[in-house]
Amino acid sequence: MKEFVISEAKVETAVLVGLITQTQDERKTNEYLDELAFLAETAGAEVVKRFTQKLPTANSVTYVGKGKLEEIRQYIHDEEEAEREVGMVIFDDELSAKQIRNIEAELKVKILDRTSLILDIFAMRAQTANAKTQVELAQYKYMLPRLQRLWTHLERQGGGSGAGGGKGSVGLRGPGETQLEMDRRIILNRMSLLKERLAEIDKQKATQRKNRGRLIRVALVGYTNVGKSTLMTLLSKSEVFAENKLFATLDTTVRKVIIENLPFLLSDTVGFIRKLPTDLVDSFKSTLDEVREADLLLHIVDISHPDFEEQIEVVNKTLADIGASGKPMILVFNKIDAYTLSLIHISEPTRH
């Protein structure tokens, strides 16, 4: 399935939106928006503006308040800066179908959330049939509860006709409930097929792991873009694709490594990130099995990152979610040459 969010034909401009809440202070929100901007750039968008708002929790109707939404609308449609052509607004949290529908109706531009952006990047990065199948399944899981919103969006954009040939109108009068239900069945059938394919892939990979013999298996884990693939290249003395972008690695790479006459198998797999979509973790079960089946985990940490401690916690939580938290683990601090205490926002030395 092709990526369905950002076109590669031209660079689209984007506005980011985040919330400062009771559980997420301003510094944390700005860090999350920095990461969201990196995600947007990885997907091929150019970020031109950020908006934040202090709220106890996200507005269930429009995510931000009415006044803030109007401020964003005015910025997007400011005639004095028409050449800016803001193409999308990206929200730092996952939005419900109702929120997306209401925000789109107000802003009249494409609305994305962190989840759809991550899914788009995964779709761009997927190279093998295995990765493509896993991403497609995750996309359908995300899309299914939002089908009605997608149909409404298409009707507004194209004014399509329904099964009876009549011109479309507001809501679902164009495609109609029958078409909506038909599409839902098509997606459910496609998801069943993808799950069957992944089950076969699971069996094949399990056989491959069994055929590797009794060599010790070591897996590199860590936050995305911390240097796992670079370390893999160094230890295995073979080229592994590495790039200063998020999720440069999706497919698992396994190499035989010998250090001081001790042979072992070293695997490099997808990195983790804050607010990683649950559906994506579930869909990548066969890839993450390399982590679950490992004898030892090397947890790579970018020690130069100002929020490296939270990144450690995110990785540990994700490992627990996939059933790999009990594995023997060694913390490996990377980019130590760029580390300075002044970069770390802590009141006392870190426990790590």
What are these regions (language model features)?
Residues 23-27, 59-61, 125-126, 239, ...:
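Flexible beta-alpha connector loops of hexameric P-loop NTPases
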Residues 342-352:
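Residue-level detector of conserved catalytic or cofactor/ligand-binding positions
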Residues 117-135:
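Short alpha-helix plus adjacent loop in nuclease-associated cores
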Residues 1-120:
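N-terminal accessory targeting/assembly segments
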Residues 162-189, 193-274:
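Conserved G1/Walker A P-loop phosphate-binding module
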Residues 8-9, 77-83, 256-260, 265, ...:
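Conserved catalytic network of the ASCE P-loop NTPase/AAA+ motor domain
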Residues 282-304:
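Inter-motif core of Ras-like GTPase G domains
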Residues 49-52, 295-300, 324-336:
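Conserved beta-strand/loop subsegment of P-loop NTPase cores
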